């Protein structure tokens, strides 16, 4: 995982007793901004440490920079691992896939790149209330019953109907107006 992961990821690591393998994001020499994670560094980590079970990438990062998720997904799956993308600041990307192309930048939404699990914070770049988010299971690789069990342990038994309603309204608006 990148060292630029959200603090909730670090909390999950502690709860799960998981020791992370860190990959430092590239830094732009001119601006000092963090760039995306280098797919070759991810592959090197997977080759070096056979105990790695999943790879987590934050894309876009806090500066809006996207990693090459398609290439990373290909590498991670070649090594038989799960790819999780924290796309908290990129929930809007699936509505802008038409931007891909001329400049060669990886504009595609992680959900369309073969990623196994994608977390979207819909309140950051879409239209839902603060605190609303979606956990997308995009392939059959993740253990969905186990994920559901863990979520039941951590989530409240009294969900916010305001947040759920805002997610419904958000998806309705985007379905009608999103193109």
Language-model-derived ranges and their functions:
Residues 1-179:
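Conserved PLP-enzyme active-site core in the AAT-like
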């Amino acid at each position: 995982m990148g060292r630029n992961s959200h603090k909730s990821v670090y909390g999950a690591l502690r709860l799960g007793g998981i020791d992370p393998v860190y990959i430092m994001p590239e830094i732009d020499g001119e601006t000092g901004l963090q760039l995306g994670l280098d797919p070759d560094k991810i592959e090197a980590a997977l080759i070096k440490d056979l105990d790695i079970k999943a790879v987590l990438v934050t894309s876009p990062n806090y500066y809006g920079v996207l990693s090459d998720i398609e290439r990373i997904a290909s590498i991670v799956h070649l090594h038989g691992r799960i790819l999780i993308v924290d796309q908290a600041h990129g929930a809007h990307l699936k509505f802008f896939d038409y931007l891909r192309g001329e400049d060669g930048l990886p504009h595609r939404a992680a959900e369309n790149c073969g990623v196994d699990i994608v977390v979207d914070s819909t309140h950051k770049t879409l239209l839902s209330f603060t605190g609303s988010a979606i956990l997308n299971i995009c392939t059959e690789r993740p253990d969905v019953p186990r994920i559901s069990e863990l979520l039941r342990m951590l989530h409240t038994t009294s969900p916010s109907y305001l947040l759920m309603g805002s997610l419904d309204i958000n998806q309705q608006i985007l379905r009608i107006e999103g193109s």
